[in-house]
Amino acid sequence: MLVPKRVKHRREFRGKMRGAAKGGRNVDFGEYGLEALESHWITNRQIEAARVAMTRYMKRGGKVWIRIFPHKSYTSKGVGVRMGNGKGAPTGWVAVVKREKIMFEVGGVSEAVAKEALRLASNKLPIRTKIVSREEVGGQSNEG
């Protein structure tokens, strides 16, 4: 699973998720991508479940790019712990995904296989998503 190697601060503020993503809105690596239609925290377990679903469907063909990384830690207090006494212990890691962010990209397979793999991945995520192609949202061309 994806976790940071080291962090400066173990406990972070929750932050705000207003507006659309500033970067990562183009399909830059593969031919097809999975775009978020709403903002949400995506846990490292959800990212891994989506990755496994895609790679199992595509078998040995193609390549998957994960464009999000869980940099933010989230905390929780134990069950039955009274209020106060500081912030809880870090529980897991999340990626802050804003709307219009491309989360996953797929390349090297046919359109039907790519769309089905991304559909299976979207079922593992807690947000509404859209499958987009490089032509729809733009992206860097691979020609030199």
Swiss-Prot record:
Keywords: Ribonucleoprotein, Ribosomal protein, RNA-binding, rRNA-binding, tRNA-binding
GO biological process, one term: translation
GO terms, molecular function: rRNA binding; structural constituent of ribosome; tRNA binding
A Pfam family reported for this protein in Swiss-Prot or TrEMBL: Ribosomal_L16
Top-level taxon in the UniProt lineage: Bacteria
InterPro entries: Ribosomal_uL16, Ribosomal_uL16_bact-type, Ribosomal_uL16_CS, Ribosomal_uL16_dom, Ribosomal_uL16_sf
GO cellular component: cytosolic large ribosomal subunit
Record note on quaternary structure: Part of the 50S ribosomal subunit.
Protein name: Large ribosomal subunit protein uL16
